[in-house]
């Protein structure tokens, strides 16, 4: 169902039961899945792929070309999974030749005025609060929650089940299962509340706590801590996830908080 004041390029591919409100513009190389609602004054540009049962609120712009001077017009996409909600004035740029696409997973909530830049890979069940700004090439694991007005530096990796406090500047990688708080952004403990809500057992949570006590509280450098964890702690999916994430970190992980003269709480 579309409103007569909506413009839809004849080459766009819309599944059944897509509803589009007035004054929205949909370009030609666009695919929209069944049951999705598009609000008024939305612009959906070439290369956008939207899954089933999504909700796109007024003013959003999806699939615009990257804000990257190296972009040379290559054919790329912006892909959004199923059951994802994109609130007012969100912008999601399509990819560059680096990854070829920007991707937002299924069951995500991207709140108003947030920006997701080129080549980002956002997992499933993620929440970005109002005005979160994510630079290019960021990788964000499933079940990440980021508080409002935070900014994420390009190429940062954020592990799954992570909570990042509002107003944060994320310039280092954030390992999985933790809370990241304060300025400068620092380890704030294990995200126990979030893990309990998602069905993690007390044994699993305590195992994760043991791992991060070694990383942040035992006086080891990062390499020593990882070696100790592999040698001394029982193997588990959580242990392997944390160890692999830290070993592959390109920007280094956030540190334990250490109050300095210029720090702000």
What are these regions (language model features)?
Residues 1-5, 10-11, 16-17, 53, ...:
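Terminal amphipathic alpha-helical/low-complexity segments used for targeting or macromolecular assembly
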Residues 2-186:
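Structural signal for interior beta-strand "rungs" in well-ordered beta-sheet cores
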């Amino acid at each position: 169902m579309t409103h007569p004041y909506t413009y839809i390029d004849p080459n766009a591919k819309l599944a059944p039961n897509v509803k589009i409100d007035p004054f929205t513009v949909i370009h030609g190389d666009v695919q929209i899945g069944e049951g999705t609602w598009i609000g008024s004054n939305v612009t959906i540009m070439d290369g956008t792929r939207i899954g089933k049962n999504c909700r796109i609120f007024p003013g959003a712009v999806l699939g615009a070309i990257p804000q990257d001077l190296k972009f040379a017009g290559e054919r790329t996409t912006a892909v959004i999974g199923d059951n994802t909600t994109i609130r007012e004035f969100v912008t999601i740029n399509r990819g560059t030749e680096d990854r070829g696409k920007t991707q937002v997973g299924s069951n995500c909530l991207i709140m108003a005025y947030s920006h997701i830049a080129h080549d980002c890979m956002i997992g499933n069940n993620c929440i970005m609060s109002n005005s979160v700004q994510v630079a290019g090439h960021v990788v964000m694991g499933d079940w990440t929650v980021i508080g409002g007005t935070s900014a994420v530096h390009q190429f940062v990796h954020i592990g799954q089940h992570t909570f990042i406090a509002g107003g944060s500047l994320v310039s280092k990688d954030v390992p999985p299962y933790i809370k990241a708080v304060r300025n400068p952004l620092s380890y704030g403990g294990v995200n126990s509340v979030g893990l309990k809500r998602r069905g993690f057992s007390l044994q699993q949570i305590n195992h994760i706590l043991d791992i991060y006590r070694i990383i942040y509280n035992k006086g080891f450098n990062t390499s020593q801590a990882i070696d100790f964890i592999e040698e001394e702690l029982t193997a588990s999916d959580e242990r392997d996830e944390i160890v692999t994430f830290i070993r592959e970190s390109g920007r280094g992980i956030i540190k334990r908080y250490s109050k300095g003269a210029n720090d702000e709480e």
